[in-house]
């Protein structure tokens, strides 16, 4: 996995995956989190979360102030397994908002920046040369996407409107109702973990950029937006 498009935290995950080091995560949420007291917004809702904080959970910023409407949308994604996309201008804290919600739910979170360096192989996986018993062998190394959907993690795609077309069609597979991911090269069909969550952030509304502010952004396939 090419870690050039992800955060330092996610580079650690990529390293562990490439070295086949076991990544330990809790399997399911085991507590309820009160929205009013946790996020300081006027709501009587409770949402599920984890009591155990792992190294893959973002650090809490105690000074962070939560916008009510955006926070409730993100919480709906966590609680009801909804795909959530957040649109806004650069520097408005879209990704940070998702991370800070995840931090208070102790929900493992991975961020991937969909710039031009992230390829289809980075997401799905590729053959790599490994050393076993003193011999070099070719072995398939799973990408970040197959690993993520099989675990209770929140996967965040930053700059969603800058993704390459081949990458976007890979992502479209997991936007379906059942969210299955087919790995044709491996003859495998992966079903998502019941606590896998998917989020995205974007600068535009999916119709491309006519302002000149966001060079490199693309129009998002309407089939994806409908999902």
Per-range role (PLM):
Residues 15-227:
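AAA+ P-loop NTPase catalytic core and its hallmark functional loops
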Residues 1-16:
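N-terminal amphipathic/basic-hydrophobic helices that include classical n-h-c signal peptides
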